[in-house]
Amino acid sequence: MSIEVIAQLASLALIIVLGPLVIGLLAARKGNL
């Protein structure tokens, strides 16, 4: 596998993992405020 493919897969995984995390943090902030 080339480095470019690995980088694309890594960025995709990051988006999939961080997406719900960020939404949860924003929801928690709104709930606290």
Curated annotation (Swiss-Prot):
It holds the Pfam family PSII_Ycf12. The chain crosses the membrane at residues 5-25. One of its GO terms (cellular component) is chloroplast thylakoid membrane. GO terms for biological process: photosynthesis. A core subunit of photosystem II (PSII), probably helps stabilize the reaction center. Belongs to the Psb30/Ycf12 family. PSII is composed of 1 copy each of membrane proteins PsbA, PsbB, PsbC, PsbD, PsbE, PsbF, PsbH, PsbI, PsbJ, PsbK, PsbL, PsbM, PsbT, PsbX, PsbY, PsbZ, Psb30/Ycf12, peripheral proteins of the oxygen-evolving complex and a large number of cofactors. It forms dimeric complexes. This is Photosystem II reaction center protein Psb30.
